[in-house]
Amino acid sequence: MKSWKRAVTVALCAASLLAGCGGDCGLSGDDSISEPQQITIEQLRAANDQRSLLEKHDTVTVTVQENDQNDAVTRTAKFQYTCVVDEVLAWYHCRYTENSTSGKSELWSEANGTMDAARMESDSTEDLSLSIYLEGMYEQYVLDTIPRCPALEEDVEQTVDSCSEQDGELLLSVTARYLASDGDYYTVLYRVDPATNEVLEASVTDYIKKESGEVSKLHTTRYRWSYDEPYQAERNVMNEVLFSTDSTEDVCDLTYFYPAPGSEKGWDVGENGWSVSEIRVAHGTRILFLDSADLALYADRELTKPIDFYDGVDTSGESATVYIVPLEENH
């Protein structure tokens, strides 16, 4: 039994997101800007909220590059998301270089409005996974995997070191220190469009304090935002994982049951109080069921055959059946 936040480790491993900053950026004394301007981090956060960006743009694209302490590139990534008929669609692609110590080579992910499919390739294996969202968790999870700026963090003390104007753009330098750490911190340099308060670029450098007291650079991650590019996934991962009900491919027929709303009140809903869904997935696909509550998985209606979370649902055969029980209902 694991929470949905812990279940999405695979999907989140490529999304080392931006850290935020706090404080005001007063520019009224800068003669290089024609009109006096005051900017706060709260205003930046509101302008760059992912839902706010989708209200102003058809698509949002984020590119990422991570360098190690020696400035060697370890990872590059591209994220893109849009909104179609009130559903957020998204995809990302991460590449790991020979300088990376992660053991991975590439990761693709695609979210289609209700599910999220991912394909991970490492030096020795290829893994497929499918995240199935229950109780309206889809949109929030998908948005959480996409870099945002500035992000809201707890237990971090943030200070604005400088704010200036250059070539018609605002440059904001921030230092953030972890309150629970004895010397670890990161710095952020934001480049902002003063007309919209949208962050155009951000460079985040992490520093770590060693036992000797020496502080050294850990890595630097650079982010760049662009808008209204054509929405086009680099790889259609969903089609590699999920198949239509009338397809002829040799796949696994997965049936999963979930307590239907109202069943706890004795209402006649679904099959004996269960809602049932049927999908067809590629053999060997790791299935993740995500919910706001912890979940228990069972292979039988009587709930006597638990499915180990780490072993997961066995999709190697012709069919598989899962009964999903939220923890508070699991008596």
Spell out what each predicted region is.
Residues 1-8:
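Bacterial N-terminal signal peptides that target proteins for export
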Residues 78-144:
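An acidic-aromatic
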Residues 25-33, 196-257, 261, 265:
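Non-transmembrane domains of secretory- and envelope-associated proteins
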Residues 314-330:
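Conserved "repeat-terminator" motif of extracellular CCP/Sushi domains
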Residues 132-205:
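Extended beta-strand-rich segments in extracellular/periplasmic secretory proteins, especially
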Residues 18-89, 163, 235-249:
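N-terminal leader/targeting segments and the immediate start of mature chains
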